[in-house]
Amino acid sequence: MILFENVKGFTYAFDKNKKDGAEPYSHKVIRGLKKLGYNVKDQVIDFSQFGVPQRRKRFILVGIRKEIGSPENFEKLLMENRDPFLAQKGLKSNVTLLEAISDLLRSNGEIPSPDRKGFYSGKYGHTKLTNYEKLMRGDYPKTHTIADSHSFAKQSTDKIECYKRLLADYPQRGKRIDGDAREQWGIKQRGITILDPDTVSPTITGSPDDYLHYCEPRIMTVRECARIQSFPDWYEIKKKYTTGGKMRKLEVPRYTQIGNAIPPLFAEQAGIVLKKMLQS
């Protein structure tokens, strides 16, 4: 049995020479697996429909050896399993950004980061928690004052002031600010999106500068990104926080590790369904 995941763009035909007849890589993979003796079913799935607080559409392919069975019912079984699975965890199918990270505000207080010299990490908030936050926290806060990898980036005064203006006056949330608007608002980077707390997050990427926190003038922490990806707080993330230049080819920093991952909350549901398919 095979479970294969990739970005939605994997299903598009890209041809550097712009010739007719370009074939999506997804088709090549499917054809190759069939030649190897697999029954194959592919689909594009939005993980936000499965309790993950993030709009993340991914190409999912399931392959089962022909002598064992067919993966045809994978998506149907996934949907049938979803509601009872989420109910058991106290969750609904659509979790908003606010419901996922409202307890990780910088205003809760901060202490020196234990794994990042010269930086500060945020303390846990003690406000009423959502069911999603309770699930992600587990018992971790009983033995830890701060969440793992919840270290705040250092930002210039100019950038902080720019972020404050955006939070106060920019009319749209959840839409990327680039082009003329970027220059008009004094944004130095290539673009940024102000997150909307009342809906699911856009797709988490490996770039920390893509998103502005919904109510604080700062970018997201690794832990906040991990929460949105449904990694529980006990899951420790290692290595550097960021990297750059030529080292991008050699290192996989924390933001990238999280941005490239399959959300565990979806992976668990997929695993349950795959197990049922093998046993049937």
Task: Please describe what each predicted stretch is.
Residues 1-182:
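Class I S-adenosyl-L-methionine
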Residues 122-280:
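C-terminal target-recognition/interaction regions appended to catalytic cores
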